[in-house]
Amino acid sequence: MSKHKNQRTASTLEKTWDTLNHLIVISSCLYRLNLKSIAQIALSVLAMIISTSLIIAAIIFIISANHKVTLTTVTVQTIKNHTGKNISTYLTQVPPERVNSSKQPTTTSPIHTNSATISPNTKSETHHTTAQTKGRITTSTQTNKPSTKSRSKNPPKKPKDDYHFEVFNFVPCSICGNNQLCKSICKTIPSNKPKKKPTIKPTNKPTTKTTNKRDPKTPAKMPKKEIITNPTKKPTLKTTERDTSTSQSTVIDTITPKYTIQQQSLHSTTSENTPSSTQIPTASEPSTSNPT
């Protein structure tokens, strides 16, 4: 139905637009022919047609919008009813054993019923429910252990702020990252693992060399330096011996290579006292002196 209405409105708007175009052309022709009175009448008719067409279009759009709104409200209501039915069927199908016994209160109020107004079927149902509640109470008392922590009677007072800001004391700092507000709120979780004691390893100490320290009063003994006396080389003495028989002269070196320091000194003293070799008679030469 909505599609047909939209098609009708579109066709009516097209017709009105065509008529407006024709009227504009006619009015322009009348102004050219200097027929002002007729042109004024045509313009007034044109204005009336425009106003009526606008009013009709507005009414049509309002009606279509209301129809859409009603459709949406109906769909929302149907969805709500459908979800409510599903929830009710789920609650009826779920057995009571699935309900957590720890969440139920330990004390249950007794059920007061008038025996005159209750049928036998309802009595059996109430008896069954009371038995179930008793069984739940016993199971909850067995499973729940008494808490060792002493609970304070007076609850902690919350800070009275306009924004109802609460400090979370058990936010781990590992979640925060780079957020400074989270770091100001969070707390580090203490690890339950026992800390290992640091083992002290024995370190090998370096051996210190003991040196005999000298007394500052006793002067240090200087090592004696050995005086090395180099032998002084003296010039070699050359002696020339002349034989009477031959005229050849022989040169005899009197210095041997293995002379000590003492022999050199003795040789120097004897060389001065001894006469020349010409005066000393040799064994090879015969003595020229006549024996007396």
UniProtKB/Swiss-Prot annotation:
Glycans are attached at residues 70, 72, 81, 86, 92, 100, 113, 138-139, 141, 199, 203, 232, 236, 254, 271, 276, 284. Residues 148-157 have a biased composition (Basic residues). Residues 1-37 are cytoplasmic. Residues 92-161, 189-292 are annotated as: Disordered. One of its GO terms (biological process) is virion attachment to host cell. GO terms for cellular component: extracellular region; host cell plasma membrane; membrane; virion membrane. The record marks A65, N66 as: Cleavage. Keywords: Disulfide bond, Glycoprotein, Host cell membrane, Host membrane, Host-virus interaction, Membrane, Secreted, Transmembrane, Transmembrane helix, Viral attachment to host cell, Viral immunoevasion, Virion, Virus entry into host cell. Residues 187-198 are annotated as: Binding to host heparan sulfate. The keyword Acyltransferase does not apply. Residues 67-292 are extracellular. Residues 99-142, 245-292 have a biased composition (Polar residues). Residues 212-227 have a biased composition (Basic and acidic residues). It holds the Pfam family Glycoprotein_G. This is Major surface glycoprotein G.
